[in-house]
Amino acid sequence: MIPNGYLMFEDENFIESSVAKLNALRKSGQFCDVRLQVCGHEMLAHRAVLACCSPYLFEIFNSDSDPHGVSHVKLDDLNPEAVEVLLNYAYTAQLKADKELVKDVYSAAKKLKMDRVKQVCGDYLLSRMDVTSCISYRNFASCMGDSRLLNKVDAYIQEHLLQISEEEEFLKLPRLKLEVMLEDNVCLPSNGKLYTKVINWVQRSIWENGDSLEELMEEVQTLYYSADHKLLDGNPLDGQAEVFGSDDDHIQFVQKKPPRENGHKQISGSSTGCLSSPNASMQSPKHEWKIVASEKTSNNTYLCLAVLDSTFCVIFLHGRNSPQSSPTSTPKLSKSLSFEMQPDELLEKPMSPMQYARSGLGTAEMNGKLIAAGGYNREECLRTVECYDPHTDHWSFLAPMRTPRARFQMAVLMGQLYVVGGSNGHSDDLSCGEMYDPNIDDWTPVPELRTNRCNAGVCALNGKLYIVGGSDPYGQKGLKNCDVFDPVTKSWTSCAPLNIRRHQSAVCELGGYLYIIGGAESWNCLNTVERYNPENNTWTLIAPMNVARRGAGVAVLDGKLFVGGGFDGSHAISCVEMYDPTRNEWKMMGNMTSPRSNAGITTVGNTIYAVGGFDGNEFLNTVEVYNPQSNEWSPYTKIFQF
């Protein structure tokens, strides 16, 4: 009921409109009163807005000696892209970050005390965690000191320990190998009590005997478990045993050797570091000891993941009969759980090729696998779809597409694969599209394009599917027009056109922007690059590539774009260049081992794969991978032999 004599009006659009205008003022630098200096990058903003979102910045602004001047805040330990994501969030309440950037956004949110953002990022990481990545996620959570995230990761590890034990990350962990001699008719206790005794033994070995953890891991340690449930150090026949734990798990210790003077060594490898977030500054708690997960894998054989003196490592424990027993009575462990298995025991072999040679194919990553669909070779335009598992180096077939299709690109949206446009071998201007659902292994049609097009770029961005550029029905002229598909309304709408007509371009998403790279205007190869901002629906020309090319592939790794292969107007090429968005610069990188035009280039896990294409003479079914540490490409893979 409206009180008599009062006018009451509520503008439903006011908040949204004001927020948008505030963000526009920030981007144009108007009325800004704070400069954030992040690793050499300067960002302007408004103190009042940031103070409302970040208690950390509020404290800085509140203690500023000149509240009316321009504040300068240095944040040298953060990723500039991550800080920009948080600035956009502060002004729009929308958090948009490329999956490769989420850990850095988390680190920045922790620094700025933006707890809600930190929690959202943590939940996102948990949603993407699987047996191949959970160890690196645990290292990250430990470095961040996030007990909530750490507990959830540990719960996942406890549930999937045996599966995790076959993964590469597990096999690279430091390992403590124990062989426990048992008196006749004596069995080892339950996991919990057993590893409590083991941890007590490790602590005493380090603190009292002067051993380092690294030295304990250099060789198999022999212990003795007696009939009265005591864990003895050394061979009891020598009369030099130490006692570690009895029925009530109280330690009874007799020093056997004097403490050493040398300090403890740091365990090498990936035991405690923040593997995927170089900007993280938090460290694991000092002198942390914890059993994360354990499993009895066979009779008297135990596997455990533990934190020993803040080092995340594996404990292998094997019980066998008394010292007089023959070594041949030891049960054989599987290779992945054996004492002998070391991270460098890998078989290097040529990567398995696809079943079909393919050029002009679509590639994408889905559920940790590489998907290669369609394309053409000397015989036909293909509708077959192959799936590559990096862990087994094996290709398998998925359900074929409904339509033979080449000269198209593929994207993953909401867990499903989308292919649109392209050529079927007879018509170079398809308007049809289809969607693959991995749950039912089948393809279904999607609404037709507004414009028939071939050689167009396709990319998922902010929950929608974009198709940009491409060639006209005659295949001689590039297009400027771009369309966007909403999977909720199942409809196509137009968005801003490109600045330059182009087809056979490489397209991808990074940091909430869409990039279209190279291509050709007619048949003249381009080195120009455009970036699309969905917030203001505009395309902007950015730094050009060093090499003009069409038919190249692009992938994202560590927040950077890698563009490889293509055709330079006269030859298929193998050169690769990298774009750093923080510097707006391109840099030449190591060449692929083979020239590849119209190949598929995709990131799976933390590895860039190049598949198929045309080398100037042959259609290819081969695969190669990029090693960022050595800046080299290789057609070989290393797999563990079990």
Swiss-Prot record:
GO terms for cellular component: cytoskeleton; cytosol; nucleus. Residues 134-233 form the BACK domain. InterPro entries: BACK, BTB-kelch_protein, BTB/POZ_dom, Kelch-typ_b-propeller, Kelch_1, SKP1/BTB/POZ_sf. The keyword Lipoprotein does not apply. The modification Phosphoserine is found at residues 246, 277, 322, 336, 338. Keywords: Cytoplasm, Cytoskeleton, Kelch repeat, mRNA processing, mRNA splicing, Nucleus, Phosphoprotein, Repeat. Residues 257-281 are annotated as: Disordered. Gene3D superfamilies: 1.25.40.420, Kelch-type beta propeller, Potassium Channel Kv1.1, Chain A. One of its GO terms (biological process) is response to virus. Ubiquitous expression. In the heart, the highest expression is detected in the ventricles and the lowest in the atria. Expressed in dendrites and spines in neurons. Kelch repeats lie at residues 369-415, 416-463, 465-512, 513-559, 561-606, 608-642. Residues 265-281 have a biased composition (Polar residues). Involved in many cell functions, including pre-mRNA splicing, the aryl hydrocarbon receptor (AHR) pathway, F-actin organization and protein ubiquitination. Plays a role in the dynamic organization of the actin skeleton as a stabilizer of actin filaments by association with F-actin through Kelch repeats. Protects cells from cell death induced by actin destabilization. Functions as a modifier of the AHR/Aryl hydrocarbon receptor pathway increasing the concentration of AHR available to activate transcription. PANTHER family: INFLUENZA VIRUS NS1A-BINDING PROTEIN (PTHR24412:SF396), KELCH PROTEIN (PTHR24412). Homodimer; through the BTB domain. Interacts with AHR/Aryl hydrocarbon receptor. Interacts (via BACK domain) with pre-mRNA-binding protein HNRNPK; the interaction is direct. Interacts (via BACK domain) with splicing factor PTBP1; the interaction is direct. Interacts (via Kelch repeats) with RNA polymerase POLR2A (via C-terminal domain). Interacts (via BACK domain) with splicing factor SNRPA; the interaction is indirect. Interacts (via Kelch repeats) with splicing factor SART1. Interacts (via BACK domain) with ALYREF; the interaction is indirect and likely plays a role in mRNA nuclear export. When the BTB domain is lacking, AHR signaling induction promoted by IVNS1ABP is massively increased; Thus, the BTB domain inhibits AHR signaling induced by IVNS1ABP. Dimerization is necessary for proper splicing activity of IVNS1ABP and this is mediated by the BTB domain. The BACK domain is necessary for proper viral M mRNA export. Belongs to the BTB-kelch protein family. This is Influenza virus NS1A-binding protein homolog. It comes from Mus musculus. The gene is Ivns1abp.
